[in-house]
């Protein structure tokens, strides 16, 4: 068989989540600072997420993943009133150290391996949002940094099977993940010259 060119190994997919919070609302004054801006007064139909994913295994040892979100709130983008700003959620590459990709470094902006719920994709979770405790600890669930993952082949196959069978899965975050991060959350410059 003819080996595929690197650009033939790139895939494109995406998803959108829309919500309306006023249907069962009993108190429009209730707010949630960590949540989306459709909760509370003046909430209506709201595009919670509109994401495209570009990804691919471009060589034996290099995998890339880029995910922009076209439904970001301007409150996290610099303006106080607008909706639906494009913003990078994930932009990283995995550099594998072995042929089975069991040992790898993830370099760039990605999810922080901070608990099971944080590593689950929002398209695979039942609730649209993560718990308030997690949203307070790791806003945006992401940061810029370098993470080392140990992901045995048989465990990665189990994670893939869980998702394929429609069960809750986390994706390919391995068994052990340890890293260093800016500590400022996603799309923010380093603010104190101290890594976390």
Descriptions of predicted regions:
Residues 3-183, 191-195:
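Outer membrane beta-barrel
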């Amino acid at each position: 068989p003819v080996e595929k060119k690197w650009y033939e190994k790139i895939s494109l997919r995406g998803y959108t989540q829309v919500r309306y919070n006023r249907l069962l609302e009993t108190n429009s004054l209730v707010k949630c600072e960590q949540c989306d801006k459709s909760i509370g007064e003046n909430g209506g139909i709201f595009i919670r997420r509109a994401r495209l994913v570009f990804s691919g295994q471009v060589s034996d040892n290099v995998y890339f993943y880029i995910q922009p979100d076209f439904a970001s709130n301007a409150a996290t983008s610099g303006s106080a009133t607008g909706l639906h700003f494009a913003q990078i959620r994930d932009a990283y590459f995995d550099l594998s150290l072995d042929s089975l990709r069991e040992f790898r470094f993830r370099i760039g902006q990605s999810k922080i391996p901070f608990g099971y719920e944080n590593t689950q994709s929002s398209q695979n979770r039942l609730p649209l949002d993560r718990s308030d405790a997690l949203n307070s600890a790791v806003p945006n669930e992401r940061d810029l940094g370098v993470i080392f993952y140990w992901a045995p082949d048989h465990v990665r196959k189990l994670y893939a099977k869980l998702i394929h069978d429609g069960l809750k899965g986390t994706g390919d975050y391995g068994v052990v993940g340890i890293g260093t991060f800016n500590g400022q959350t996603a799309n923010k410059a380093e603010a104190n010259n101290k890594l976390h």
